[in-house]
Structures are given as C-alpha cells and as structure tokens.
A protein has these predicted regions:
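Transmembrane alpha-helical segments and their membrane-water interfaces
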Residues: 68-78, 97-150, 175-188
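Hydrophobic core segments of transmembrane alpha-helices in multi-pass, intramembrane catalytic enzymes
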Residues: 57-68, 112-124, 173-190, 206, ...
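Transmembrane alpha-helices of multi-pass inner-membrane enzymes
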Residues: 65-66, 362, 387-440
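Transmembrane signal-anchor hairpin modules in multi-pass inner-membrane enzymes, especially those
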Residues: 1-98, 121, 131-134, 141, ...
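Hydrophobic transmembrane alpha-helices and their immediate junctions
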Residues: 351-393
Length: 440
C-alpha cells in the first residue's frame, strides 16, 4: 500500500502538466520579484538622485513610470478603488482641469501646465504601487538617502566651494524646504519603527538634513521644524503619557532655543524680526521681508478684484505695475519681485477662489485621509502614514513663504510620496489577495 502511494505521488509530481504548472508558477513569482525589486530600488534612489544628480530624480521616475506601464499592461488582477482613492483622483483631476481652463481663458503659455501635469503623469506609478508587495525599507531608506545627500551637497557647496547659501541643484529656498522635510520624515520613521539600529540611522538623517537646511539659510523652511515637532507630539506614535509629552514639549522648546544660539540662524532670525517690525511700524517695505509682505498685499488686492477666476498665469508683473502706478503698493515691487512667495496667495491671484480651493485640497485631503487611517492602523502602514502626515505639514509650512508647486523638484517629491503612501497604506486590506493572484 505504501509502495503504491509512493508511486502515485511520484507520478503526480512528474506529470508533464504538473511540471509545466510548477515552472510557470516559479517564472511568474520570479518576474513579480524582479519587477517589485526594481521598483523598490528606483524608489530608494529617487530622493538622493533628485537632490544631487542633474535630472536624476526625473530619470528615476521615468524608469518607474515605464516599469509601471509594463506591469499594468500585463496584470489581470482587479483591485477596486476605495472612497479615499476616488477622492484623491478627483482632486488631482480638478486641480489639472482648473490649470487647463486658466490656460485657455487667459491664453497663457503652455508651460503653466508643467507641474500640474506631473500629478497626472505619475498616476500609472500609483496604480502600479497599489498592487505591489513593496517593502517598507525601500521607502524609509530612500528618505534616509535623500537626507544624507542633502547634507553632503550642502556641506560641499558651503565649505568647499564657499557659496553664500547652499542650494543643491536648485534655488536655496526649495532646497532648504526639501531638506527640512526629509529630516522630519526621518524623525517620524525613527519614532515609529522598532529596530534600534534603524532608529539611530534615522535620527542621524534628521540631524544631517537639518544641518543642510541651516546651510541653505532658508528662513521659511525653518518654520517647518517646530511645526513638525509639535505634529509628532500630537501624533504620539510611542503612546507617551501626558507627563512624557510635556517633557517632550520642553525638550522641543530647548532645541529651538539652542538653535537660536547658532550665529547663522540668529542673524537670519534677527533680520526677519527687524524687517517685519519696520514694515508694520514705519511702513518700510524696502527690505527683503518688507517686499514679500508688500507682495502678499498686492496678491490680496488682485484677488479681491478678480475673486472667481483670478488674473491668469503670466499676468502678475503687469498687475504689480498697475498697482504701483496707482500708489497702492511700493513701486519697487514692479521691478524686483518675480512671484508671490506664497503658494496659497499665488493660487488666489492667478486662479481665483477655485484655484485656491483646489490647491488647499491637494494638501488637506491627503492629510485628513492619512490622519484618519493613522488612528486605526499599525505596523508598516502606521509608519508610512506618519511619514505622510509629516510630509504634508512640512510642505504646507514651506508653501507659506514660497510658490511650492512652481518648483519642479518639490512638485515631483510631493506627488511621488503622496502616491506612494496612498498606494501602500490607504488601499483596502484585500489588496494582498489581489496582489497574490495577479498574473502576467
């Protein structure tokens, strides 16, 4: 009986159809592993390449886009969109549609669609990511690599080349903003993972990225540090007691106070305070901060006169000139300011109330989704959601003093990580079944 059973089992294993099925299954798993691993490597490399290699981030995303299109074309699995994802896609579509309508209405240059189109172009990457078994380490180590890259290039530029402000491969303002954002994302990972060695690396990434931002002398980006630290205290990832959170608040206050003793920071902060005081007490707009505040005033005036649709992209300079000629703003603005230095005011004056709402929703909708999911998730998803919340809070803060979505690198970075976190942490739990059943 045992001999017969052994013969039957042997024949079953060696049956041609069974062998073919096993080989096909192995090849399928190998293909899936290769595609997912390649995608993970590209996601890992993306932040560092974005910061230190000309067009490096764009090339990494282009390869990821091509990989996504290949997998989506071969995949037969279905993973229905949930309400969170539908709302995200709706907001992205509305944002682009408003940009397109603004282009048509005011006959603006086609280049105004540049950054808005990136949200649409990266959608295949999102649909690909939501079906993968991508490991958390590719995302977290990628953030760390970006933070280290910021420090390396900032130190090289400041101390070896002797440039006044570290800027990476872009303007110092977006560079400083991305640096502090990467640093805060490292900190959020450090506080939500369990690995002791991982925590040390992530804390190091936080410090290095903060140094890079300091070397950029970008004051608006520095505001993200206290906002990020307070956000982390409110998220309470380690479930600290009230006493522990009070102690954490005091430590945060101490860190910020000690930061002020750094001469470079002290000089920039003191200059900011003096500029603001001069603007409001002496009506002196002939300073760096004074001109920015006067620009905000011009944007509010322009919006009040065109509240629904705005003035259109490319018409800001002519509006400044008209306001200066009527003595409603400082005449110096007409020749010295290129943009509004505030993403939300920029959306208001260029695209009106509709543009402002769509811009706000690009930040606030993912923020609300991530926070709602964060309260009920655990493990890797909770780590990713904490990263997403910090990303958005830091981005909102830097957007208060700069035209956030006018910068290619910031737009690519924000869109990529929003899609990554949605795809990995906000899809339905049934995604695991769909991913296992996917075939090519």
């Amino acid at each position: 009986m045992q001999v017969e059973l052994k013969i039957i089992m042997t024949n079953k294993i060696l049956h041609p159809e069974t062998v073919f099925s096993n080989v096909a299954s192995f090849i399928h798993r190998l293909k899936t592993f290769q595609i997912d691993t390649t995608a993970g490597v590209l996601i890992f490399l993306f932040p560092a390449l974005l910061m230190v290699v000309p067009d490096g981030g764009a090339i990494a995303l282009l390869l990821l886009l091509l990989l996504s299109l290949v997998k989506l074309a071969r995949s037969k699995s279905q993973l229905p969109l949930n309400s969170n994802e539908i709302w995200l896609l709706a907001i992205v579509s509305i944002y682009f549609t408003i940009e397109l309508f603004n282009l048509w209405l005011f006959e603006s240059d086609i280049s105004v669609l540049d950054n808005a189109s990136r949200f649409l172009l990266l959608l295949p990457v999102y649909f690909f990511i939501r079906k993968t078994n991508l490991s958390l380490k590719y995302v977290t180590l990628g953030i760390l690599s970006g933070a280290i890259a910021c420090f390396v290039i900032a130190s090289y530029q400041k101390f070896y080349l002797g440039v006044p402000r570290a800027h990476g491969l872009q303007n110092p303002v977006p560079f400083g903003g991305l640096s502090i954002t990467l640093g805060l994302m490292c900190l959020s990972v450090a506080l939500t993972i369990e690995s002791r060695q991982g925590k040390i690396w992530m804390y190091s990434g936080f410090l290095l990225a903060c140094i890079a931002s300091i070397l950029s002398e970008t004051r608006g980006a520095w505001l993200a540090l206290p906002i990020g630290l307070v956000t982390i205290l409110l998220l309470n990832p380690k479930r600290w007691s009230i006493k522990a959170r009070i102690a954490g608040s005091l430590v945060t206050l101490l860190i910020l106070t000690l930061s002020y003793t750094i001469p470079l920071i002290q000089h920039r902060v003191d200059a900011t305070i003096l500029n603001v005081a001069a603007y409001f007490t002496e009506a002196n707009a002939n300073t760096s901060i004074g001109l920015r505040l006067e620009t905000w005033k011009a944007a509010i005036i322009g919006f009040s006169e065109n509240p629904m649709l705005g003035i259109g992209e490319g018409n800001f300079q002519s509006t400044l000139k008209q306001l200066a000629e009527s003595d409603r703003i400082n005449p110096l603005l007409a020749t010295s300011i290129a943009h509004v230095h505030n993403e939300f005011l920029s959306a208001m004056i260029h695209k009106g109330g509709l543009g402002l709402i769509s811009t706000l929703l690009l930040f606030l909708l993912p923020l609300a989704t991530f926070y709602r999911q964060y309260k009920s998730q655990h493990g890797e998803r909770k780590v990713l959601l904490a990263v997403g919340i910090i990303l958005i809070m830091s981005s909102i803060t830097t957007a208060l003093s700069d035209v956030f979505f006018d910068h290619h690198k910031q737009t690519l970075f924000y869109a990529t990580y929003i899609y990554l976190i949605y795809g990995l942490a906000c899809t339905d739990i049934q995604k695991n079944t769909a991913k296992q059943n996917s075939s090519y």
